[in-house]
Amino acid sequence: VYGGQSINTGAVNSNTVTINGGSVAGGIRGGQSAGGTVTGNTIDLNGGQVAGKAYAGYSNNGTVTGNTINLDGKNGINITGAWLYGSNATATGQNNNTLNIRNFKGRAQNIGNFDRIDLDLAGLTLRAGDPIIVLTEKETTRLGNSTIHIHTGGNAIAHTNSALVPRYEVIKNKTDAGLTAENVKYEKGQITVRQNGALQALYKVEWDGPGIDSVDGDSIDLVKTGETEIVPGTETINESRLALTDFLNAAGDFILDRKLQCSLREDGSIPETCFYGAVSGGDLHHDLNGNKAWAHTTGTHWFIGLRSKLNEKQDTEKDLNGALYIEAGWGNIDTHNRWAKGNGDIHYYGIGAIGERKQKEGNWKSTYLQAHARIGRAFSDYNSRLKDGSGEKLDYDKNSTYYGAGLEIGREWQYHPDYMLDSYLKYRWLHLNGFNTEINGADHKLDDIDSHRTRLGTRLNYTAEKTGMPYIGIAWEHEFDGNARGSVMGYSLKDTSLKGDSGVLELGVKFVPSEKSRWNYDFTIEGYVGQREGVMGNFVVNYLF
């Protein structure tokens, strides 16, 4: 098959032969002249079966320059019986006859006489002892005087399903004839090879021969140049878990910030037992330490509970109250760091208990102490946009147990008949169990997460109207820990955490339809600034039995 041909001294320029399928048995000439120049001719090998000698350019007496063979194995091509040559003359490095190899893994008879070889290995699977291109002719493969270039762009990622090794063979003559690469120039650049989409290392292209003019070498290799490391951005998996932790923290705040108060009876007394329930919706953004990372959560929280007085009515010194509740929530998460983004769905179910003691007389009158504990199960279905060399994304669908506890101490000051100031200090701990999982063939060990927070604040309540009592509050919150740690195939993930300070502003109103109503309502808007930013809206319904 000829792209162009001259049987005398005519020039043969700019012809193209394209093979997309079928069978070619007798060789190919991109351009051929008996005595003229042959320039700018191209052979595109995209599919089918090709045998015989394929010359990008061929001239008996003229110059052969700027001719190209493009070998693309994307659609499958068999060149087991083919020889690929840039020209019929030995390469000098000056004639720009080029072989471009892309998406190809297979066998050929031999290659040679190219001034430039361009390797695009993106997406290919590398294995130790399994060359990308195997040459089977018992004649030395001569790549001398050429320039070998390897694609190094952002998408130039090969992959392997086994441990990264010091060398991978790319072009290998499997016979005793060997492969020579004297005076070869290796253009600067390295390719990333990823193991199971989790670990990676940089590799450069290099001949395996010991020296110039030696025939002891037999391959062009990828040679490891740096240490094995976790793929940057893989910590996105822990960022998603921090998003879940923050969502659970918001749920706890929502429940625990609601005072255990029932609607008053008609005579003004406090009932012993009441039912209460609430719903909250929020949109929160949390900056995570390091790598310009953040986590964003949106969703709703629900709970229903039963509050009861625990001490005798005749006790004039103190009030003891307790509550049991069921909690649940559903939401969405988005995460971002310098290298990767992700999103997912989360939900949880749990139970909890709250106990409160309030002093009714003495020097500590109106001082209260609250303790709580909660436990449940949290579920996360997360998908990141971080890909391995084969295009597989890092994702998981797991669930784990969470539990927590905390203390709150505060005091109410009725410094004016119409105004009451409630100041408090809160400590809250939440624990989210870690888990082990396999993602794209890589073992991930994700450690437990512990959140330790304090909140110092005060709330001003207007108490003149019993049917409508607005309030405003401010608080400072500090997260001491909230670190997410883990490892991938024994290599430690970069730490990321919720640690930091946030400010809280709340505006709300408590109201009852009438003084005789068994219903009590509480509506609050909370705004956050700092490490945690966003808005929460809470609505509580309280019913007297």
Please identify what each model-predicted range represents.
Residues K292-H296, W339-D345, R385-D395, E438-L446, ...:
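Flexible, surface-exposed loop regions and adjacent strand-edge segments
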